[in-house]
């Protein structure tokens, strides 16, 4: 079965997380799940890291951006990863390792660039 472009990004992220020894899981979107939950929920050095993956021109939905924002507001780290910035995962993990005893958080998404256009 051919992998989707977003699936390829997820595979790259998964390889990095496994190589770095990061605990993570990938919530499955179901009818009974919570909409907007990031693709990867990770814990590294006691810090929450949420990763939303996108491919091509895909943009996070408003619910996804709200979830990422909420994680940041609770001292977690959050980022949107695309084919062009998979290295942001490594950078976020490095940041966590260097700042694991501080209240700093990693913001790996641009609210303006990643905003879902309002189509109402």
What would you call each of these model-derived segments?
Residues 1-120:
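Catalytic phosphate/metal-binding cores of nucleic-acid and nucleotide-processing enzymes, i.e., regions
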């Amino acid at each position: 079965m051919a992998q989707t472009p977003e699936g390829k990004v997820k595979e790259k992220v998964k390889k990095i997380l496994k190589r770095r020894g990061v605990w993570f899981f990938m919530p499955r979107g179901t009818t009974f799940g919570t909409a907007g939950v990031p693709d990867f929920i990770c814990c590294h050095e006691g810090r929450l890291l949420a990763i939303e993956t996108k491919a091509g021109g895909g943009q996070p939905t408003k619910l996804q951006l709200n979830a990422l924002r909420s994680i940041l507001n609770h001292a977690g780290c959050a980022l949107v990863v695309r084919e062009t910035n998979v290295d942001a995962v490594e950078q976020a993990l490095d940041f966590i390792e260097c700042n694991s005893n501080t209240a700093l958080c990693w913001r790996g998404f641009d609210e303006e660039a990643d905003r879902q256009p309002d189509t109402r």
